[in-house]
Amino acid sequence: MNMIWRNSISCLRLGKVPHRYQSGYHPVAPLGSRILTDPAKVFEHNMWDHMQWSKEEEAAARKKVKENSAVRVLLEEQVKYEREASKYWDTFYKIHKNKFFKDRNWLLREFPEILPVDQKPEEKARESSWDHVKTSATNRFSRMHCPTVPDEKNHYEKSSGSSEGQSKTESDFSNLDSEKHKKGPMETGLFPGSNATFRILEVGCGAGNSVFPILNTLENSPESFLYCCDFASGAVELVKSHSSYRATQCFAFVHDVCDDGLPYPFPDGILDVILLVFVLSSIHPDRTLFI
């Protein structure tokens, strides 16, 4: 039986313990309690806990790894593929559009703490048993090159509420993305999501298979904002052109997180949650040090 690995990274903003955001609902089974006893039920959950490989399974895995490594890509081609990775992903999205990957509708069921729901007093006792699920990870994005913004402007209050207003908002922030984001750190207090009280960043958003399940849920949470980025410009364009994309609550931008010299379209220290879904496994180990 194949072992299903689970790798999730959620970085919570430091210094906000008195005002924690948590979801009001939980996964069907809490982390650590999904024990597979009946092999026929292997597909009932997205993952299983405490799985142990038999000697036969480990031997089979080593055999597969050896077979996979029998033919290696030439070093010069490795360098080329790494250097032009975004180009190849652009070609991929040009061919497949948003039809290749399925929406991750399971994401919020497995990780309800992503959602910005205030903790209710009557739920505190019940939530205490879930403390082992939650982490207070150190902000991995402390090197973001974006100055602290002294004065946040409520840009959305002026432009939301009509299709014309949303178009203007999207246009304004598209200009911000193309000009300020490329030239360097922001020189103005205006930035996407400046009026939000809860902010999520998804790294490696692709065609939006995590973005839109989250964004659809955030529709009833106007104080929340979702940032998403990808180093493939074709992927970002697919997200922006999607019918569910709302510039008043989401900002998609092109970014390579392995390049710590690139600025972000928002200031330091404002993120509550950072998602990297199937991202680290696609990056060369030597480059993960810059994330």
Swiss-Prot record:
It holds the Pfam family Methyltransf_25. There is a cross-link at K80 (Glycyl lysine isopeptide (Lys-Gly) (interchain with G-Cter in SUMO)). Residues 1-21 form a transit peptide. Its EC number is 2.1.1.-. Residues 159-168 have a biased composition (Low complexity). Coiled coil: none annotated. GO terms for molecular function: mRNA methyltransferase activity; tRNA (cytidine-3-)-methyltransferase activity. Residues 141-187 are annotated as: Disordered. Changing I4Q: Partial relocalization to the cytoplasm. It is found in: Mitochondrion. It catalyses: cytidine(32) in tRNA(Ser) + S-adenosyl-L-methionine = N(3)-methylcytidine(32) in tRNA(Ser) + S-adenosyl-L-homocysteine + H(+); cytidine(32) in tRNA(Thr) + S-adenosyl-L-methionine = N(3)-methylcytidine(32) in tRNA(Thr) + S-adenosyl-L-homocysteine + H(+); a cytidine in mRNA + S-adenosyl-L-methionine = an N(3)-methylcytidine in mRNA + S-adenosyl-L-homocysteine + H(+). GO terms for cellular component: mitochondrial matrix; mitochondrion. S-adenosyl-L-methionine binds at W89, Y93, G204, D230, D256. InterPro entries: Methyltransf_25, METTL2/6/8-like, SAM-dependent_MTases_sf. Interacts with EP300. Mitochondrial S-adenosyl-L-methionine-dependent methyltransferase that mediates N(3)-methylcytidine modification of residue 32 of the tRNA anticodon loop of mitochondrial tRNA(Ser)(UCN) and tRNA(Thr). N(3)-methylcytidine methylation modification regulates mitochondrial translation efficiency and is required for activity of the respiratory chain. N(3)-methylcytidine methylation of mitochondrial tRNA(Ser)(UCN) requires the formation of N(6)-dimethylallyladenosine(37) (i6A37) by TRIT1 as prerequisite. May also mediate N(3)-methylcytidine modification of mRNAs. This is tRNA N(3)-cytidine methyltransferase METTL8, mitochondrial. The lineage of its organism: Eukaryota, Metazoa, Chordata, Craniata, Vertebrata. The gene is METTL8.
